[in-house]
Amino acid sequence: MINRTILVGRLTRDPELRYTNGGAAVATFTIAVNRQFTNQNGEREADFISCVIWRKAAENFANFTHKGSLVGIDGRIQTRNYENQQGVRVYVTEVVVENFSLLESRAESERHQAANGGSGNNNYNNGNSNYNNNNNGYSNQGQNAAPQQSSANNNNPFGNGNTGNASSAAPSSSANNNNQADPFANNGDQIDISDDDLPF
């Protein structure tokens, strides 16, 4: 059985970082994902998907993202339920994030934030950061969230800045040392890609 979710979209609000009674960090946020088709008015509609991320990855996510940030999310869908203070059973469906990537540069993110009048967090790692969240699940009964242990997962479908043929595309000069975080910084050079490597 497969339960895998990959999303690319923008945050609808700043991530909300909290800590469980056991001291584990947990951040919740909502990501807006545009649909692939347009409605009758020619506009693209969006789906708003609730997400949760745990531990150190949650702290990193909260520190490096803000409302409007473009992110890639890799995780799984989870449905849980709890009884609220009024005694009503509440069902929640959300994506438990295992990996994420920041998909825009610091300058683009700041430009987007300024255009929207936001005042989020400005701590970035040049737009090429990838984070793994090794928590594969949790149970949450109201305020007493308790993380479950799981094996480490280092698979990242969004890649990291050091994979692929980026090294063959970069010149061997001192400028290369300054651009290691951005494999596409030397955009004037040719890139050796065969037709078999292209997804279309």
UniProtKB/Swiss-Prot annotation:
One Pfam family it belongs to: SSB
Position of sequence motif Important for interaction with partner proteins: 195-200
Keywords: DNA damage, DNA recombination, DNA repair, DNA replication, DNA-binding
Domain SSB: 1-104
Statement: the UniProt record of this protein carries the keyword Nucleus: no
Gene3D superfamilies: Nucleic acid-binding proteins
Gene Ontology terms: biological process: DNA recombination; DNA repair; DNA replication
One Gene Ontology molecular-function label: single-stranded DNA binding
Biased composition (Low complexity): 121-187
One cellular-component annotation, GO: nucleoid
Record's keyword annotation contains Ribonucleoprotein: no
InterPro entries found in the cross-reference section: NA-bd_OB-fold, Primosome_PriB/ssb, ssDNA-bd
Family annotation (CDD domains): SSB_OBF
Superkingdom of this protein's organism: Bacteria
Disordered, as annotated region: 108-200
HAMAP family named among the record's database cross-references: SSB (MF_00984)
Function (record text): Plays an important role in DNA replication, recombination and repair. Binds to ssDNA and to an array of partner proteins to recruit them to their sites of action during DNA metabolism.
Subunit structure: Homotetramer.
Name of the molecule in the record: Single-stranded DNA-binding protein
